[in-house]
Regions:
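Secretory/organelle targeting and membrane-embedding segments
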Residues: 1-172, 176-512
């Protein structure tokens, strides 16, 4: 196993450190839905970037499955174009030439038995030609309605069978159902064919460096964890804001909405990592156990009308351009009640967090694209300074910036230079891009590599998915019975009702 040395090596890394990077063993990846946007913009470039970093085995194989009437060479050209346009690392001909050796394409529809037999033959051929050892991951980059038929076809044609020390794995993209009942049905279908340790549910947020850094920040340092509790924390705000509209996703988005699309998975996972107890170790079972405890302890306020807000973007100005509202978007029903903004207040019934509200919000066409977790601390119980000295002093906060500008900011009060005592907020800032010269890998690079390695640390388990739906389902049911979403102009930070929700608690949203 050759040691791979990254170009632009990290100056903070000890040159005497002889730990090898984790490199996948003999294996291949089959992508269903290989002609879609996700495959072209994320999956294919991530595979190339892993190969470019020396983290894939020499005989790695990539198989595309779709309806297109393509030869292997046509598929290779599509991958080539996607890599050239979207890859994070520079294009190198020698890496490409090695990767192309293991590329194959299988033409067919999901209900085509002959196509799945051809897929089985292709995998057997690659085992001989590329030495993949029977180890294949099946990536279902397909609409949820197609999951059951693809899973059943894999079973019917013995593609899910693990023999002679080889492995087979299923990779599933969100949404994992649209409510608890459908999630349970989907899980039953998947687990009829694949055991739980063979199933990898992709939440790409968990592949981001800054999300993993939540655990490092909390548990590798002694200065944060002692104050990470109800005795010191006033409240927590978790925000995922987008400045774009729905684009061409009307067919997917309408009827799903912001809460199902983002809160059920991304934001509740961020809440779990922020609030969980320290795991016994950093292995998948220990992490999942602590996340499940937190999600199981989440409680909804009794009055959902006052503790939740949904909104829909109206026409407005975004980045200096006039943009249309959600109901004017192509393909959207003019009477649609789908939420493009959602804000909820949650509490966690355990000793660490009792009485501390967690405010989650997400939305499209907001002020800017940003994802952050803000842990906001209580004010000092006593201040020796007079009120004029501290009138501009806010609350201390630790803000974890997930995207963009990945990093951490600590906000605290400091004396303003001068003859009088005046205290204002200042910030201490850590930015990934400045402290580490190696650029962070894309989330899909990390996640695909983990699938090939069989490392399920960063993948939500069945229980986490179902617990998340148990939290969201009552909110969705309440919204279904009570009127329409509040309107908010594009380019703003959401409906005024969301500001009023926090104002009733004597708080206000952070302006990221």
């Amino acid at each position: 196993m050759a040691r791979h040395t990254a170009t632009g090596a990290n100056p903070l890394r000890d040159p005497a450190d002889r730990r090898l990077p984790r490199i996948a063993g003999p294996s291949g990846l089959v992508i269903f839905g290989v002609t879609g946007d996700l495959s072209r913009k994320k999956l294919m470039p991530a595979v190339y970037d892993l190969a470019n970093r020396g983290l894939l085995p020499p005989g790695f194989s990539l198989v595309g499955f779709a309806r297109r009437d393509w030869e292997h060479e046509d598929f290779a050209q599509v991958v080539h174009d996607a890599v050239k346009e979207h890859a994070r690392t520079p294009f190198r001909e020698e890496v490409w030439q090695q990767l192309i050796q293991g590329m194959r394409f299988v033409q067919g529809t999901f209900d085509d038995d002959d196509a799945f037999e051809r897929l089985r033959g292709t995998i057997e051929e690659l085992d001989k030609a590329q030495g993949t050892g029977g180890n294949f991951a099946f990536y279902l980059s397909v609409p949820p309605k197609s999951f059951p038929v693809v899973i059943q076809q894999l079973k019917k044609h013995r593609l899910a069978d693990q023999t002679d020390g080889s492995w087979r794995r299923a990779v599933i993209e969100k949404p994992f159902g649209h409510d608890l009942k459908s999630a349970e049905e989907l899980n039953a279908i998947v687990h009829e064919v694949f055991a739980s340790e063979q199933v990898f549910r992709i939440d790409h947020y968990l592949g981001k460096e800054t999300v993993q850094n939540i655990l490092a920040l909390r548990f590798a340092n002694t200065m944060f964890e002692p104050i990470w509790n109800r005795s010191f924390v006033d409240h927590v705000q978790i925000t995922m804001a987008e400045d774009i509209g729905i684009g061409g996703r009307a067919g997917y988005y309408d009827g799903i909405g912001a809460a199902r699309d983002v809160i059920q998975n991304h934001l509740l996972q961020l809440l779990a990592l922020t609030a969980m107890e320290e795991p016994a170790s950093f292995d998948a079972d220990a992490l999942a156990a602590e996340k499940e405890k937190v999600l199981g302890a989440v409680r909804l306020p009794k009055d959902l009308g006052r503790a939740t807000v949904r909104g829909q973007y109206a026409a407005g100005w975004q980045g200096g351009e006039k943009v249309i509202g959600y109901l004017e978007e192509e393909g959207i029903d003019k009477k649609s009640k789908t939420d493009t903004y959602a804000a909820v207040k949650l509490e966690i019934d355990n000793r660490r967090w009792a009485g501390v509200p967690f405010y989650l919000r997400t939305g499209k066409r907001l002020g800017r694209r940003v994802t952050e977790i803000a842990v906001v601390f209580q004010r000092a119980p006593h201040s020796p300074f007079d009120t004029t000295a501290t009138e501009e002093l806010g609350q201390n906060a630790i803000v974890i910036r997930v995207q963009p500008d990945e990093g951490v900011t600590v906000r605290f009060g400091s004396k303003v230079p001068g003859t009088s005592m005046e205290i204002r907020d200042v910030s201490m800032d850590f930015a990934y891009g400045e402290s580490f010269t190696e650029s962070s890998p894309e989330a899909y690079e990390r996640l695909i590599l983990d699938v090939l390695l069989g490392d399920s640390n960063l993948f939500p388990r069945t229980e986490e998915v179902e617990l998340s739906w148990k939290i969201l389902d009552p909110i969705e049911a309440h919204w279904d019975k009570h009127g329409k979403p509040a309107q908010y102009p594009s380019g703003t930070w959401g409906p005024v009702e969301a500001d009023e929700m926090l104002a009733r608690d004597g708080r206000s949203w952070r302006r990221p």
